[in-house]
């Protein structure tokens, strides 16, 4: 009985061993058909490439020589980088020392005179002059009398040179975009347009005409007449028609706060005009600086007279202006200094009178061409009236008539609107003061 039980237990153990042997085991993975993973990181960069074939042959020798060349190039590059590191650090250190010597902030001055290689006389914006030293790191080739230099704020030593020393005020005076006005926008003034073309446009576009005639073209013109007769408008049309550089300035801009800044601005204005020649310089309201000279104890009046003297020198000085034409405008020509408007400086004086009936009609036609007029509008009544209307007054009448129609929510301008606007414009012109905004 016991033997049977032991036999049965042995058979069960053998059966369990067979089950264990039959347990599934996955096959060993193979590398056939799979890409070998590339090692990454610094270890891969330092590892030399494998060279095949493994046997000794000439092909293996050539590959090893090529690897050697690459390693030598890498070694040379690393040594050069290591050698340049101290130089870069040295340059950075020297640059910081130069910045410390210059100091911050740096003031801007004008170089008046170079005494020797290490000393110069400079002037500041307040007008005072100083005998100062020139530091060794300043480029001496760029130093010349009249240039703008950087000064140390404590000892006023020259620590640098401004490469672009163009006055920002002169840069603003240069027109980047031509005005929209053309000769077609000017009513009448046919004679004035012809004269300014002969004096300004033709010498720049066709100088050979004057050479064949054996004459020198005019250097400049002055436009004078009552206010609102089209002087500035004609200058805008000239700027639109010509491709020359156009510089415009108002006479009051030449009057500066500090001593000597006004003449300096005039010199800078004409210097920029020469650099960008052919060019046209338009000076509006010239009576602000060009009035008759008289004895005065006021420092401001003497500064204005010095500015005018510099303007006289630029117009007809020792140096020729070249292809630089000057247009001046004023409504008080009787107050100008005779030396300013004499022949040789201003060769042509173009008068702008008040418009006659024919000119008034053309001006009204220009300003009403885009307006929607009612059938009862009769512009002849406004034109035939004996009122002293300038071109600006006619434009104001048309604008006021359009505003009256807009106020009453009408799309057409009537004859009554023109009558009321004319009365309003003439009343304001007579009184000289604008009407009250609130009634």
From Swiss-Prot:
Q: Does the keyword Cytoplasm apply?
A: yes
Where are stretches of biased composition, namely Basic and acidic residues? 12-25, 82-102
Q: Which residues bind ATP?
A: 225-232
Please name the SMART domains in this protein's record: AAA
Q: Which InterPro entries does the entry mention?
A: 26S_Proteasome_ATPase, AAA+_ATPase, AAA_lid_3, ATPase_AAA_core, ATPase_AAA_CS, NA-bd_OB-fold, P-loop_NTPase, Prot_ATP_ID_OB_2nd
What molecular functions are annotated in GO for this chain? ATP binding; ATP hydrolysis activity; proteasome-activating activity
Query: What GO terms describe the biological role, i.e. biological process, of this protein?
Result: proteasome-mediated ubiquitin-dependent protein catabolic process
Give me the ranges of the annotated region Disordered. 1-48, 82-104
What cellular-component terms does GO give this entry? cytosol; nucleoplasm; proteasome regulatory particle; proteasome regulatory particle, base subcomplex
Q: Where is the signal peptide?
A: none
Q: Where would you find this protein in the cell?
A: Cytoplasm; Nucleus
Q: Which UniProt keywords apply?
A: ATP-binding, Cytoplasm, Nucleotide-binding, Nucleus, Proteasome
Q: Which family does it belong to?
A: Belongs to the AAA ATPase family.
Query: According to its UniProt entry, what is the function of this protein?
Result: The 26S proteasome is involved in the ATP-dependent degradation of ubiquitinated proteins. The regulatory (or ATPase) complex confers ATP dependency and substrate specificity to the 26S complex.
Question: What quaternary arrangement does the UniProt entry report?
Answer: Interacts with PSMD5.
User: What protein am I looking at?
Assistant: 26S proteasome regulatory subunit 4
């Amino acid at each position: 009985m016991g033997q049977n039980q032991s036999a049965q237990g042995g058979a069960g153990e053998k059966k369990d061993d067979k089950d264990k042997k039959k347990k599934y085991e996955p096959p060993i993975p193979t590398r056939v058909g799979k890409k070998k993973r590339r090692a990454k990181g610094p270890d891969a960069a330092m590892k030399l490439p494998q060279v095949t074939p493994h046997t000794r042959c000439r092909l293996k020798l050539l590959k090893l020589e090529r690897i050697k060349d690459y390693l030598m190039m890498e070694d040379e590059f690393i040594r050069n980088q290591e050698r340049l590191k101290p130089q870069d650090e040295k340059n950075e250190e020297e640059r910081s020392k130069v910045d410390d010597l210059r100091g911050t902030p740096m003031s801007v001055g004008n170089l008046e005179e170079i005494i020797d290689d290490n000393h110069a006389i400079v002037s500041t914006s307040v007008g005072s002059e100083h005998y100062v030293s020139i530091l060794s790191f300043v480029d001496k080739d760029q130093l010349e009398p009249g240039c703008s230099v950087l000064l140390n704020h404590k000892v006023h030593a020259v620590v640098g040179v401004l490469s672009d020393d163009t006055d920002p005020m002169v840069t603003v005076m240069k027109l980047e975009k031509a005005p929209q006005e053309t000769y077609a926008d000017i009513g009448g003034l046919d004679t004035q347009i012809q004269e300014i073309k002969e004096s300004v446009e033709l010498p720049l576009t066709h100088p050979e005409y004057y050479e064949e005639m054996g004459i020198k073209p005019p250097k400049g013109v002055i436009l004078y007449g009552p206010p609102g007769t089209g002087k500035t408008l004609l200058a805008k049309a000239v700027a639109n028609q010509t491709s020359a550089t156009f510089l415009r300035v108002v006479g009051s801009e030449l009057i500066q706060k500090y001593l000597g800044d006004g003449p300096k601005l005039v010199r800078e204005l004409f210097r920029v005009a020469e650099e960008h020649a052919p060019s046209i310089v338009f000076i509006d309201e010239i009576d602000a600086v060009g009035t008759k000279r008289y004895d005065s104890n006021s420092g401001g009046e003497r500064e204005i007279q010095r500015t005018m003297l510099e303007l006289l020198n630029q117009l007809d000085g020792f140096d020729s202006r070249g292809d630089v034409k000057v247009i001046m405008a004023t409504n008080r020509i009787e107050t100008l200094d005779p030396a300013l408007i004499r022949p040789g400086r201003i060769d042509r004086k173009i008068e702008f009178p008040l418009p006659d009936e024919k000119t008034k009609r053309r001006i009204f036609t220009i300003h009403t061409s885009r307006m929607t007029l009612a059938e009862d509008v009769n512009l002849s009544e406004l034109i035939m009236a004996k009122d002293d209307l300038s071109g600006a007054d006619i434009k104001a009448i048309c604008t006021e008539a359009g505003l009256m129609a807009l106020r009453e929510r009408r799309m057409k301008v009537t004859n009554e609107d023109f009558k009321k606007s004319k009365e309003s414009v003439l009343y304001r012109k007579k009184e000289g003061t604008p009407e009250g905004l609130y009634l």
